[in-house]
Curated annotation (Swiss-Prot):
The keyword Protein biosynthesis applies. This is Arginine--tRNA ligase. It catalyses: tRNA(Arg) + L-arginine + ATP = L-arginyl-tRNA(Arg) + AMP + diphosphate. Disulfide bonds: none annotated. Belongs to the class-I aminoacyl-tRNA synthetase family. The keyword ATP-binding applies. InterPro entries: Arg-tRNA-ligase, Arg-tRNA-synth_N, Arg-tRNA-synth_N_sf, ArgRS_core, DALR_anticod-bd, Rossmann-like_a/b/a_fold, tRNAsynth_Ia_anticodon-bd. A motif ('HIGH' region) lies at residues 122-132. It is found in: Cytoplasm. The gene is argS. SMART domains: Arg_tRNA_synt_N (SM01016), DALR_1 (SM00836).
Length: 564
């Protein structure tokens, strides 16, 4: 039974049901210091009803309460403080972890419901930059977390492969491009063209107009325009898939904006049939004043569609195809207003399922405090950063363990894992500065620190070379360090649920750091392999810790090497 439930049931019985179990569970607190117990109930909540001071109420409850399952229950001022039975709790938690293994913390909350996750979405014909990392790894982690809780995540790479920028790129290719040069080095050459034509379009309205005309041709099915566009797309995907392979991220569908180009007329006609479209300066808009939003521009004066038109078609397609229980969009915080407009237009059209669409925004990655910008050519390729992280990891592994057999493979796991972990430990809505020195460090709150704790446990277990009978373990939790680990292990299922509820992988990453820290304190204070009556209990404790560390890392898309 969950410790909050245990405390709440005992309290509700002690106060004759004045507060129900759920009411009590909602106000149970954790004391600031573990010396004051594991959980605390503030008696202020009963003062008015019982017409007594909170201090008196706390004292009366502590005397009356059934202490079964607790080491002791005491009154501390206006609080009733509960100390859990350490040995019983440890036995229960460790047996549960060792029995369930990687499935510890699993739940069937989602009951198989589909959850499409719009993620990564790099732009065709542009480098896969560090700026694309967040959507990719946050989306991948949320998918793993949701799958653990019984949902069916559907990872969709909504490639940026449609829009006026491709008209401009075709313009640049026709003016300056060379097929052989681009074929030899596609992304770099296309980036040069993109930066050059954007600079020209800013200065010369005729260049901008030419780009607009080429995009219009794409929308109208012009053979030459689509042939060049498809070539850009094909060479880009080859590069992207290589990078996804390094990241260890896969997708269920690659569905770019172009996939929906023939589905937009239907959504525009639907809005028109419901009298939602209004003309404004020759363009078609949906008035969203009642939502305190600016009008949504659906079609421009020249008939070209916009980002929101394509997203309306996308949302309708996903509902029809996947019948989702939730539809997540892991897209940067700068798009918040766009998603508010998107949901509002769908709501106006009578699609209440739009309530199940969730924008999962995130903060920006900078380097040296500066924003990445492809238009200006200020771009750092993610692949180069990953390769550099792996090189740094290999040097550290060489220094720590020169005789490690599979150094190169472990270096990949540590280097790539370091970059992903650093991103995911950052609160989603916050940004961070991309700093490889900090990321790949084996000290501090980093991925390598957590991985090293897991590898250290595996090393101890190999050295012990002893099979532990989980049904016959003596677990005497006599030290504070072991108890901290037990409490952390017990909390893991709640951590997974909290991460899912808030679309927040950082909850898992921070938990993994705290569990690794708890183990390292235990390792420093306890002779784990001492041959005494408690040896099997200690091995069971660290084995359970290893299982949960590995699973926490897996939920973040980070490997857990057995050796480092």
């Amino acid at each position: 039974m969950d410790e909050k439930q245990l405390v709440s049931q005992a309290l509700s019985a002690a106060i004759d049901g004045v507060l129900g179990v759920e009411q009590i569970a909602a106000i149970i607190e954790k004391p600031k210091s573990s010396d004051l117990g594991d959980l605390a109930f503030p008696a202020f909540q009963l003062a008015k009803t019982l017409r007594k001071s909170p201090q008196i109420i706390a004292g009366e409850i502590a005397e009356k309460i059934d202490t079964k399952g607790f080491e002791k229950v005491i009154a501390v001022g206006p609080y009733v403080n509960f100390f859990l039975d350490k040995n019983a709790t440890a036995s229960e938690v460790i047996r549960e972890v060792l029995t369930e293994g990687e499935h510890y913390g699993d739940a069937n909350i989602g009951q198989g419901g589909n959850v499409p996750i719009d993620m990564s979405a790099p732009n065709i014909a542009k480098p896969f930059s560090i700026g694309h990392l967040r959507s990719t790894v946050i989306g991948d982690s949320i998918a793993k977390i949701y799958e653990k809780l019984g949902y069916q995540p559907i990872k969709i790479n909504h490639l940026g492969d449609w829009g006026k920028q491709f008209g401009l790129l075709i313009t640049a290719y026709k003016k300056y491009g060379d097929e052989a040069t681009i074929t030899a080095n596609p992304i770099d050459e296309l980036l040069k063209l993109y930066v050059k034509i954007n600079a020209e379009a800013k200065e010369d309205p005729e260049v901008d107009e030419e780009g607009r005309q080429w995009f219009l041709k794409m929308e109208q099915g012009d053979e030459e325009a689509l042939r060049i566009w498809k070539w850009f797309s094909d060479v880009s995907l080859i590069e992207f898939n290589r990078i996804y392979g390094k990241l260890g991220v896969s997708f269920d569908h690659f569905m770019g904006e172009s996939f929906y180009s023939d589905k937009m007329d239907a959504i525009v006609e639907d809005l028109e049939s419901k009298n939602l479209l209004h003309e404004s300066k020759g363009a078609l808009i949906v008035d969203l004043e009642k939502y305190n939003l600016n009008p949504a521009l659906i079609k421009k004066t020249d008939g070209a569609t916009l980002y929101i038109t394509r997203d309306l078609a996308t949302a309708a397609y996903r509902k029809k195809t996947f019948n989702f229980v939730k539809s997540l969009y892991v897209v940067g915080g700068e798009q918040t207003n766009h998603f508010k407009q998107l949901k509002a237009v769908l709501k106006e059209a009578g699609y209440d399922w739009s309530d199940d669409m969730v924008h999962v925004p995130f903060g920006m990655v900078t380097q040296g405090g500066k924003k990445f910008s492809t238009r200006k050519g200020h771009v750092v390729k993610l692949e180069m950063a990953l390769d550099e992280a792996v090189d740094r990891a290999e040097k550290q592994i060489e220094a720590k363990n020169p005789n490690l057999e599979n150094k190169e493979e472990v270096a990949k796991q540590v280097g790539v894992g370091a970059v992903k972990f650093y991103d995911l430990k950052t609160d989603r809505n916050n940004g961070y500065d991309f700093d490889l020195d900090e990321m790949v460090s084996f000290e501090g709150e980093t991925g390598p620190y957590v991985q090293y704790a897991h590898a250290r446990i595996q090393s101890i277990l190999r050295k012990a070379n002893r099979k532990v009978d989980i049904n016959n373990i003596s677990l005497a939790v006599s030290d504070a360090e072991a108890w901290e680990i037990v409490k952390a292990l017990k909390e893991f299922p709640n951590v997974v649920k909290r991460a899912a509820d808030n679309y927040e992988p950082s909850v898992i990453a921070k938990y993994a750091i705290s569990l690794a820290q708890a183990f390292n304190k235990y390792y420093a204070h306890v002779r784990i392999l001492e041959d005494d009556a408690q040896l099997d209990g200690r091995l069971a404790l660290i084995s359970a810790t290893s299982i949960v560390l590995k699973e926490a890392l897996r939920l973040l898309g980070v490997a857990a090497p057995e050796n480092m």
